[in-house]
């Protein structure tokens, strides 16, 4: 049986209210841990084209199913509620290529 390909959560974020955003940062890690997420990159990035976001984040999950479950989880819904109004964000999930 083959393992499903990894999945990647890609977030582009500009924080507009740093104090309120701390509420998100305090509880979001619990959701990511629960679903086995691994942070591959985060912080400022050099924008070559497109919108210039303050922060970029790339998180790896063992599968698309795990990434979706994390996003839909009660833990992450609570974190998203803390994030609302504290930042502008685009979040996408993308499936990895698997063995190439």
What is the predicted function of each stretch?
Residues 68, 76-92:
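C-terminal structural segments of small proteins and small subunits
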């Amino acid at each position: 049986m083959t393992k499903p390909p990894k999945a990647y959560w890609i977030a582009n974020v500009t924080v507009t209210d740093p104090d309120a955003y701390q509420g998100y940062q305090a509880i979001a890690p619990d959701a990511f841990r629960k679903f086995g997420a691994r942070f591959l990159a985060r912080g400022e990035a050099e924008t070559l084209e497109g919108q210039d976001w303050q922060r970029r984040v790339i998180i790896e999950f063992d599968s698309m199913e795990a990434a979706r479950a994390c996003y839909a989880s009660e833990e992450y819904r609570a974190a998203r509620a803390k994030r609302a109004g504290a930042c502008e964000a685009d979040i996408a999930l993308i499936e990895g290529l698997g063995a190439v």
